Amino acid sequence: LAKDNEVIDPQLRTAMEMAPSATQWPNNDYARVLDIGDITIKPDGTVVGTYREIFKLFNERARRLAEVSIPYNASYQSVRVIQARTIKPDGKIMGLRGTDMRNTSMFNDYPLYDDTMSLGFSMPGVEDGCLIDYTFQEITRPVLMPGEFWQYWTFDGTDPVMLSRFTVHIPSDKAIHYQVFNDPNLHPKITLSSDGKVRNYVFEERNLKPIVIEPAMPGMNEVKKWLEISSMDTWQQIAAWYWALSKPEAVPDDSLRSEVNQLIAGKTSEPEKAAAIYAFVADKVRYVGLEFGLSAFRPHSATEVLQNLYGDCKDKATLLITMLNVAGIRAWPALLESGDNSLIHNQLPTLSSFNHCIAVAFVDNSEVWLDATSASCAYGDIPVSDRGAEAMVIRDGVGQFEMIPEYTPDQSGLDSVVNVQLNGNGGANIETSATMLGAESQQWRETARNLTPDQRLQLMQQWAQSVSTGATLQKWSLPDGSVGNGNFSIQMSLSAPHLAKTTVHFMLIPAAIGLNDSNAHNPFVQDTRVWPIVVSNPMTEHSVTTINLPSGYEIEELPPDVSLSTALFEYRRTTVESPDKRKLVISVTSISKNGVIPPALYTQVKDYYNAILHANGDLIIMKKTG
């Protein structure tokens, strides 16, 4: 640590002068006053980066910033703190002591990943209105792709930014590519050193407002201002490099072959074999949740992963690919950025573009995407966070970008059947069944597999209450969530003593009975909208509710049918009386389609949801006979 912690250098003085007050940003917990990155590219490709952060903390919620953690990979990086201090509101400066720092492995329990480290420290004397100021250096040695380099920088975020500056110093004889996103007016200032040996690029943004966060908004890469630089010319350089890393690790031994033979014994078709192997890797090999690249980039050998029964995304993909190949099924690695549907091929070629590794197999002449990190995904399904992403599939060293298919509305959602037997006092016996598909199936399977028996019962009891207040379970069925087919089905029988309200002459029963819940509230409550509405998880929810009338009552009034639509959403409800007038069948269908809705149509979408909520309050009125 620097010994001049109490010296107010020019950068700190500037930060103190332009630091805003809490009243200027009442909806923010802090401001990023100074955000500086300065990197030097050495002739051998070594990257020496110096980073300085100065934050103004407005309130107690901002104190989380006092706990600083700097992740790095010890196999090719080193990190040291140059200076760290807190400037209190009265101007007093409290410096961090060297003994207050801690260097720890982020995954101590997993020896395969002990190179994934974190340098952490706690800023002293933090209180409302203080500044925290720390500077650290990160050195990245050129061991991954010798001679190549890449960097990534974000200028804004959900907090106000007073000054964000990113500077690159590079030998003048080295080529560099840069690309700025979401700010056409940002251009670097480029200069040469006095001796002409170093070229300097300075990118700077000032006085950036916080990014407005809204439900169903575009991904952050689509709205934030960010920059990437790279020395690489084509994506094929990365494809060839990763293939050379991963192919030697996808070699089976006798133990792995034996495991595959046991898994596929008695199975004759390729889909059966692929499903059995996928289920084993997804369910039996523990997933260590490291982003691609945090623990180096070379996967561990498939045999080692099988022996240890744990691995990160690239390890599980390598094991899956190796086992499929042993079974005679071709499979390859696919790199992607999970949770981001940006078109990666339009970006510069960098390893920072990927945070996940999965597999794609060729089964019975069809392409099948397989993400073995998600035990909640059945064979043939793929996590919602992967869908719509552009993945680079690497076949025999050649990379090709392919879109992971998004769900269509009929592939995801909920299909429910409800049978209601009313009695004369307003109570009812209710039989329900629900089948979840796609994303809904994944969510329920993930929930179910993590519950104890008592928790499973509690979940079903809560669901019974959502159908009718005061309802009690009679019997129920909830699968354990293990990897199986793509659907997830639940059955439930319950007694609902207060389903309907009764008066001297009438019985009132809600028209909305059942298990559809996506329309139970309006997700769009703000008066105005900044960003487009992105529907990335299309689905269809369909329910059929049959109400058997009690003796001594007849239908007095039925609610009107409902038909609503706007942009990418549709809602329909019909109520049909049986010929003998002893049954009602209520059918509800709700459809959302994938796409983008411009902000100009926001009011229509908001009104659409409000209209559904209003319709949910409709009543069926029955009158006593005789």
Regions found by a protein language model. Give the residues of each.
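A sensor for short, sequence-defined functional sites
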Residues: 2-626
